[in-house]
């Protein structure tokens, strides 16, 4: 009969993972509870997988993203910019906001090629590269969510306060709003970066993405507060829609613009929710006093989970052009007209029109009606 160790006799399992610090006055029961919480933490989704299995899964997901989503996001956002700029005289106020949203998404899609094959999260060991990618990611995130928040507020003004705000809802004020939103997005990223960089300037492995204060700001300013405002706007919009339906009904054009903005907001929420939950779980866990950001990096602890939530966030920038193409009838007509102008050969012209007709459904309204000034 084989000899057993004392640990085996009492059924004790030895925990080899990272050890959490225990308070000086902690009891054995409290220490065991903290270890149990660590093992059952929500972020620990891949504890039963080997490093090789996690690498294979991450590589497979990265290939799927690169083959299917990246071309849609890259080409789609460029088309939104090129087509709308080509017909700038027919550009509406919602189109102007969507152009800026497409520019922000295009930045992230281009940056995603670096991040998408960061399979073992080793890019975060390079301080300059980690900080560079984090800055681009945050600027895109802030600009996207700020534009969506402002677009929701603009829809509320167009539906509920049309008479009072008609003089202020002009293209000039829309361009000014876009400029202010970009300034706010850059400031919300660079001001915290400057502050924490001065404090951690002597740390060789400093990474902007791993600073807890920056992560709290990202979750609060980039997710919780904007979506609270968006939720309030849409609750007021629903009330305005009920009133409009009772009295005179709502113009079809306003309904379509509202439906498209709501779809973009919903996709943004679904794609960015895992990233913010992942960061929040890390922030709510205990941190050892005096630890540097390198030692607190949650992306090193859960590389596969971090990779999955990053891919989900990048997917938002790839799906927005699809929503804009299928729900934006004005853009579909502009795209057909743009293709007709750029394809001089009759055979190529017919092929492009047939392809567009097969991929993008026909509009139900005439083009001259859709190109009229928007609300």
Curated annotation (Swiss-Prot):
Expression across tissues: Expressed in the brain. Expressed in neurons of the hippocampus, hypothalamic paraventricular nucleus (PVN), supraoptic nucleus (SON) and the median eminence. Expressed in magnocellular neurosecretory cells (MNCs) which secrete oxytocin but not in MNCs which secrete vasopressin. Expressed in glial cells. Expressed in the nucleus ambiguous. Expressed in epithelial cells, in pachytene spermatocytes (PS) (at protein level). Expressed strongly in vascular endothelial cells and poorly in vascular smooth muscle cells (VSMC).
PROSITE patterns linked to this entry: G_PROTEIN_RECEP_F1_1 (PS00237), G_PROTEIN_RECEP_F1_2 (PS50262)
Chain ranges passing through the membrane: 63-84, 97-120, 133-153, 176-194, 221-236, 260-280, 307-327
Modification after translation (UniProt): Ubiquitinated; ubiquitination occurs at the plasma membrane and leads to proteasome-mediated degradation.
Glycosylated position list: 32, 44
Keyword Coiled coil among record annotations: no
Positions in the Extracellular compartment: 1-62, 121-132, 195-220, 281-306
Membrane-topology descriptor: Multi-pass membrane protein
InterPro entries in alphabetical order: GPCR_Rhodpsn (IPR000276), GPCR_Rhodpsn_7TM (IPR017452), GPER1-like (IPR047143)
Pfam families: 7tm_1 (PF00001)
Subcellular location: Nucleus; Cytoplasm, Perinuclear region; Cytoplasm; Cytoplasm, Cytoskeleton
Recorded GO MF terms: chromatin binding; estradiol binding; G protein-coupled estrogen receptor activity; nuclear estrogen receptor activity; steroid binding; steroid hormone binding
Family statement drawn from the similarity comment of this UniProt entry: Belongs to the G-protein coupled receptor 1 family.
Subunit relationships: Homodimer. Heterodimer; heterodimerizes with other G-protein-coupled receptor (GPCRs) like CRHR1, HTR1A and PAQR8. Interacts with RAMP3; the interaction confers proper subcellular localization and function in cardioprotection. Interacts with KRT7 and KRT8. Interacts with EGFR; the interaction increases after agonist-induced stimulation in cancer-associated fibroblasts (CAF). Interacts with EGFR and ESR1.
Name of the molecule in the record: G-protein coupled estrogen receptor 1
Organism: Rattus norvegicus
The gene coding this protein: Gper1
